Amino acid sequence: MSKTLSFKTYSAKPAEVERTWYVIDAEGLVLGRMASEIAKVLRGKHKPQFTPHIDTGDFIVVTNAEKVLLTGRKSEQKTYFTHSHYPGGVRIDEVKDVIRTKPERVIENAVWGMLPHNNLGRQLFRKLKVYAGTNHPHASQSPIEMKIN
């Protein structure tokens, strides 16, 4: 007797998801292209078991955050807008200042904008680890180097 073919949609179970750790060297990579690939892997869209409402993604460690590239005139024109929710609490930071002081924020902000803005998106975002410089504390997870074109 042969096995019958099932046409039911597969739905991943959280306990069955296998997580892999990846490391990305951001040196010389364009910010937006890198962020979209990171968001895809965090979400799990690179896996055949992808299920939209389940966290099927992998962990990402990004190093050399201060060496990411911005195309065009974004290094002079791009700004980050924050507000403290107090009167006069508007703060506008230029991207070149943010890269100098907190380079991790530039990559985190770009990736966060590409993830769903709900509970699942916050859970996915916690799997992103960004570091300035080449050292990171996740060597014990033996991350696989990921190449982005």
From Swiss-Prot:
Keywords: Ribonucleoprotein, Ribosomal protein. The keyword Ribosomal protein applies. One of its GO terms (biological process) is negative regulation of translation. One of its GO terms (cellular component) is cytosolic large ribosomal subunit. GO terms for molecular function: mRNA binding; structural constituent of ribosome. InterPro entries: Ribosomal_uL13, Ribosomal_uL13_bac-type, Ribosomal_uL13_sf. It comes from the Bacteria. NCBIfam families: rplM_bact. Belongs to the universal ribosomal protein uL13 family. This protein is one of the early assembly proteins of the 50S ribosomal subunit, although it is not seen to bind rRNA by itself. It is important during the early stages of 50S assembly. Part of the 50S ribosomal subunit. PANTHER family: LARGE RIBOSOMAL SUBUNIT PROTEIN UL13M, RIBOSOMAL PROTEIN L13. This is Large ribosomal subunit protein uL13. The lineage of its organism: Bacteria, Pseudomonadati, Chlorobiota, Chlorobiia, Chlorobiales.
